[in-house]
Amino acid sequence: MCIRDSHYGEISYPGKNNSQLYKEDILVGYRWHDTKNIIPSFGFGHGLSYTTFELFDINTNKNKYRLNEKINVVCKVRNIGNVEGKEVVQVYVGKENSKVERAKKELKGFKKVKVSSNEYVEVNINIPVKELAYYDENSASWKIEKGDYIIYIGNSSRAIAKEIKIKIL
């Protein structure tokens, strides 16, 4: 296609913008729904399967972290259905009483695992503390707020199996 073709009507250039400009700022998609307490029809990460899973024995390696450390989230995924399947474990993090506008929770890690029927697998997801930073427009730099955070573990933004409180020192 060239400009000459569209100029002489040999092709029809639609003239439509193929990009999307969001007005929600940082609260796009599931972040908007969660932060504004709006229940969507399907949460982020929701999906259907021919089998059923449960998440259990969910923990972090500790509850206090320094800036150079990693948060290790461990959980087990059991397939309680009759056929083999795959499940995605999702880890979200939220900052309590943030001094800046932030989403209630943000996806920080995930892992897809295959689990045979009536079996379970252990899942480890590591999140560097530096991934909890926010962008400060005034200083044009990334900053990490110290204090309390909540780790949300589940298989979608609306299906949270456990919440764990941690502290960044």
Residue ranges and their predicted role:
Residues 82-99, 105-107:
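Short acidic, flexible loop segments centered on an aromatic residue
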Residues 128-169:
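Terminal connector regions
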Residues 70-72, 120-124, 161-163:
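Intrinsic-disorder/low-complexity, polar/charged segments enriched in Ser/Thr/Lys/Arg/Asp/Glu/Gln
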Residues 4-86, 92, 146, 150-154, ...:
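Secreted, periplasmic, or luminal enzymes acting at the cell surface/secretory milieu
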Residues 99-137:
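Intrinsically disordered, low-complexity Pro/Gly/Ser/Thr-rich segments with frequent PxxP/GP/PP motifs
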Residues 61, 78-80, 94, 126-130, ...:
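Solvent-exposed residues in well-ordered beta-strands and their adjoining turns
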